[in-house]
């Protein structure tokens, strides 16, 4: 069946989001993953997070009395080039589509900060203490910014606005709300398998979006892009009568005896006697077990103690054991014992 190509792959049963001292940094831990999937998913999510999430940024600035970026402003300690570099670091959040125009006006002495900008609509300054420039006594400055929405990084030469205004200076725009993304892949255990993947993804944002939502958006982008490659109809699921699917015995009987952490001697004796599941074991009597080659009282007592902890004992009668589809049932109920 073609659906086994994806249905029989192990799926993560643990997704944990962790916060750090810095509220803009968070981590997501996903496990277990098939071998190699940690690298595959980690790299794909990282690239999408850094390149494809939308945000807001300043695209151009007009400063009264300034014709180009190589000018200086009387009474302002920074030259225009430094001011533009500071403007590029202003972090914004805006749900509405741009462009929007905002203004800041201030007289010296004092510091012009991002929080001094008169925002419009739902626009929010995320780093209001960020310094734009410093004014001396008697100095005055008025700046008008164009704020737009987009994704990725747009250089200043692509932000040129041909509206006839003199002195409108384009600015490099980093729209992405994601600042840094890193990931690491470690081994993790699931049942008796020790080499599944554990993925830890660490995301640093500018505050416009939290890490959990950012990962969700990136995963949705990947899902939308990859769906184009699925060229077949989803196979119809086989309808199973609920009455037939209900077990008539304890699901713990579907657990394999090699998961009981028995001594090597006891485990080998059970293996040699073709005892695979606990359901096979509990139907054996004590006398039958003692007739097993190399199986003695010490092994018998060990097994009786382990079964007692599970509410089971030797010599039990299970009329419906073994079920016909025992392997499928064991997989279905493995998380219940």
UniProtKB/Swiss-Prot annotation:
One of its GO terms (biological process) is DNA-templated transcription. Residues 249-337 are annotated as: Alpha C-terminal domain (alpha-CTD). It catalyses: RNA(n) + a ribonucleoside 5'-triphosphate = RNA(n+1) + diphosphate. The keyword rRNA processing does not apply. Its EC number is 2.7.7.6. Residues 1-233 are annotated as: Alpha N-terminal domain (alpha-NTD). CDD domains: RNAP_alpha_NTD (cd06928). The keyword Cytoplasm does not apply. GO terms for cellular component: cytoplasm; DNA-directed RNA polymerase complex. It comes from the Bacteria. GO terms for molecular function: DNA binding; DNA-directed RNA polymerase activity; protein dimerization activity. Keywords: DNA-directed RNA polymerase, Nucleotidyltransferase, Transcription, Transferase. It is an enzyme of class 2 (transferase). InterPro entries: DNA-dir_RNA_pol_insert (IPR011262), DNA-dir_RNA_pol_RpoA/D/Rpb3 (IPR011263), DNA-dir_RpoA (IPR011773), RBP11-like (IPR036603), RNAP_asu_C (IPR011260), RNApol_insert_sf (IPR036643). The N-terminal domain is essential for RNAP assembly and basal transcription, whereas the C-terminal domain is involved in interaction with transcriptional regulators and with upstream promoter elements. Homodimer. The RNAP catalytic core consists of 2 alpha, 1 beta, 1 beta' and 1 omega subunit. When a sigma factor is associated with the core the holoenzyme is formed, which can initiate transcription. DNA-dependent RNA polymerase catalyzes the transcription of DNA into RNA using the four ribonucleoside triphosphates as substrates. Belongs to the RNA polymerase alpha chain family. This is DNA-directed RNA polymerase subunit alpha. It comes from Bartonella quintana (strain Toulouse) (Rochalimaea quintana).
